[in-house]
């Protein structure tokens, strides 16, 4: 009888010892690192010049608009240029309207005025927080001859958390474009 008890105890210990305990793995986070931006001066026949990230691909349009592509980030900056012809109020209103169309999905829109008196460049930078289609836009003008607006769009469903590293990188490029912009 003692042998049977010892045998049953050994079988029970063997069965309990053979169970593989599953340990849950922690959630992994995708780390997106982008190289430090290097900038080159961009100039063509259009009446505006600015610094451009050397990793970006720029395409000029006949109306002096530009698309700046970031293939690795699946994003594009769209720049449109318009001459001012007694229509500065309409141009400003349209640029502001474009930004505030995102208020439905945006958590917050931060306005940051921009003034460069030395080069006659005045404008507004908008940082759009939340799951809006764009997370940054700006416009600049000299109020008499030139008007330029700029926005970035990603080729993905808006999800601020997932595009935040790329959005932050491109937002810095947009600020550089705005701050280095000169009228010809």
Residue ranges and their predicted role:
Residues 151-184:
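Surface-exposed amphipathic alpha-helical segments
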Residues 77-85, 137-138, 160-168:
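Second-shell loop/turn segments in exported
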Residues 45-97:
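Secretory pathway targeting signatures of secreted, lumenal, and periplasmic proteins
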Residues 26-46:
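Post-signal peptide N-terminal segment of mature Sec-exported envelope proteins
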Residues 19-25:
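Bacterial lipoprotein signal-peptidase II cleavage site
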Residues 96-151:
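Signature of long, low-cysteine stretches enriched in small and polar/charged residues
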Residues 1-5:
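Positively charged n-region of N-terminal signal peptides that target proteins for export
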Residues 14-17:
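C-terminal motif of bacterial Sec signal peptides marking the signal peptidase cleavage site
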């Amino acid at each position: 009888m003692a042998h049977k008890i010892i045998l049953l105890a050994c079988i029970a210990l063997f069965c309990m010892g053979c169970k593989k305990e599953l340990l849950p793995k922690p959630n992994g986070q995708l780390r997106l690192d982008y190289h430090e931006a290097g900038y080159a001066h961009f100039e063509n026949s259009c009446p505006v010049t600015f610094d451009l990230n050397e990793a970006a691909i720029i395409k000029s349009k006949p109306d002096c608009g530009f698309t700046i592509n970031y293939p690795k980030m699946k994003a594009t900056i769209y720049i449109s240029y318009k001459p001012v012809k007694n229509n500065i109020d309409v141009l400003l209103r349209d640029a502001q309207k474009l930004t505030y169309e995102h208020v439905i999905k945006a958590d917050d829109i931060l306005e940051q005025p921009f003034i460069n008196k030395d080069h006659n460049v005045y404008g507004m930078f908008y940082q759009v927080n939340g799951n809006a289609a764009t997370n940054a836009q700006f416009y600049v003008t000299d109020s008499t001859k030139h008007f330029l607006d700029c926005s970035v769009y990603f080729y993905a469903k808006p999800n601020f958390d997932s595009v935040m590293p790329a959005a932050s990188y491109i937002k810095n490029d947009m600020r550089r474009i705005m701050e280095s912009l000169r009228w010809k």
